[in-house]
Amino acid sequence: HKITHFGGAPIILNMLANTPKEEQIKLNHKVYVLTAAAPPPSIIFKKMKELGFEVMHVYGLTETYGHILQCAWNSAWDELNEDEKADISSRQGVRYPNTEDVKVMNPENMKTVPNDGKTIGEIMIRGNVVMKGYFKDKDATKKSMKDGWFHSGDLAVMHPNGYIQIKDRSKDIIISGGENISSIEIENT
């Protein structure tokens, strides 16, 4: 059908990327893909590119009316090797223009975490794309809307180039032997 664009969750991309070779159809044109709904492993980007797909990862929530971050390609990355390109592509990205502000902040003191790619904080969003509250649930609204920010519950780091990368959902962190272990890191190994 000569499609040029489609959207699919990482699980769909994984199914396409791991289709047996004898069932794969060779594309003679590039297909652009938007993926969201979960943090995709970097290997998916590499495999999809080999099949002729150009994948962009975006991030958003129901509470933010669509995506608020996009992993927009930076031409400085053109010189990187394919593994490095795939790793960068798996990040959630930078603020989408329709969103007033997105930061990775320490929820305890509401300070922005350093752009070091290591310090974990919570993704917080504000702007006219953020919901006003949960329908008939004042407690949930009060818990998620504090200090003028929507608290996403997603734990992330901010890289030196300003790109945000999710490490886990706060409720999915595994604590073992006093260490915080990311369920996403386990899934990606």
Give the label of every model feature segment.
Residues 1, 10-12, 19, 181-189:
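ATP-dependent adenylate-forming carboxylate-activation enzymes
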Residues 6, 127, 132-133, 155-189:
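AMP-binding/adenylate-forming catalytic core of the ANL superfamily
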Residues 11-13, 40, 130:
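Alpha-helix capping/helix-boundary segments
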Residues 37, 60, 93, 154, ...:
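Active-site glycine-centered loops adjacent to acidic/histidine catalytic or metal-binding residues
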Residues 83-89, 129-153, 170-171, 183-187:
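Conserved ANL (AMP-binding/adenylate-forming) active-site segment centered on the GW(Y/F)…HTG consensus within
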Residues 95, 101-124, 160-161:
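Conserved beta-loop-beta connector loops within the AMP-binding
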